[in-house]
Amino acid sequence: MKKLLVIDFKEKIKYEDAWNFQRKLHDLRVNNIIYDTLILLEHFPVITLGKFGNESNLLKRKEELEDIGIDFLRVDRGGDITYHGPLQLVGYLIFRVEGVKNFVLKIERSIINVLNEYGIEAKENLKYPGVWVGDRKIAAIGIAIKKKVSYHGFALNVSNDLTPFSYIIPCGLKDKKVTSILKEADFSPSMEDVKKKVCLSVVREFGFDSFKVFNFSSYKELSNFDMLLEDQ
């Protein structure tokens, strides 16, 4: 039986904390101690630059970002530069991966299914990873794979402020814009509804037989991390 573990954080999480958590789960998945795991959360404002990204795509000085409460980090995922913040759904996938292209395509289709439910006609782009509405990117994807297990994942703009994307050249694409569910559908679904739809869509696209959700109000609650292992 193919089972999915879902970890749902109810409060915003610092990027560094989520990054460290992913690495712990990655080690556990590599050693077959846990099932494939999907982490769903929102971040405090942060701009991240992928390992092959170009820092010239950052349009503000780091000191300016700090003054307006946005962190900046260079990270070990693929992709270029992007922004994460409140009311944007971030999903991290700690999955065993057989084929990279097919894996990314399943992530994209999982998100497209959700957007279709909100009446948004979205699609993948064979040239540029992510999910698009016309020429506007609504979800970014950046992953890393080590020892055939993934980490990092996707960021879906729900009803977040899009202004911080003007501080960067998103994903290094100068002629592309960003959008959100709010902007495209003219209403703001609850984050809980989006999470539920994403979870069910991932289960369908990746062919899981069952899933179990663990809710945490904050990163500090991970002192109860053993409860995840006991369920395996």
UniProtKB/Swiss-Prot annotation:
The keyword Nucleotide-binding does not apply. Belongs to the LipB family. In the reaction, the free carboxyl group of octanoic acid is attached via an amide linkage to the epsilon-amino group of a specific lysine residue of lipoyl domains of lipoate-dependent enzymes. Pathway: Protein modification; protein lipoylation via endogenous pathway; protein N(6)-(lipoyl)lysine from octanoyl-[acyl-carrier-protein]: step 1/2. Pfam families: LplA-B_cat. The active site is at residue 171. GO terms for cellular component: cytoplasm. The record marks 137 as: Lowers pKa of active site Cys. Residues 32-219 form the BPL/LPL catalytic domain. It is found in: Cytoplasm. It comes from the Bacteria. Keywords: Acyltransferase, Cytoplasm, Transferase. This is Octanoyltransferase. GO terms for molecular function: lipoyl(octanoyl) transferase activity. GO terms for biological process: protein modification process. The gene is lipB. Its EC number is 2.3.1.181.
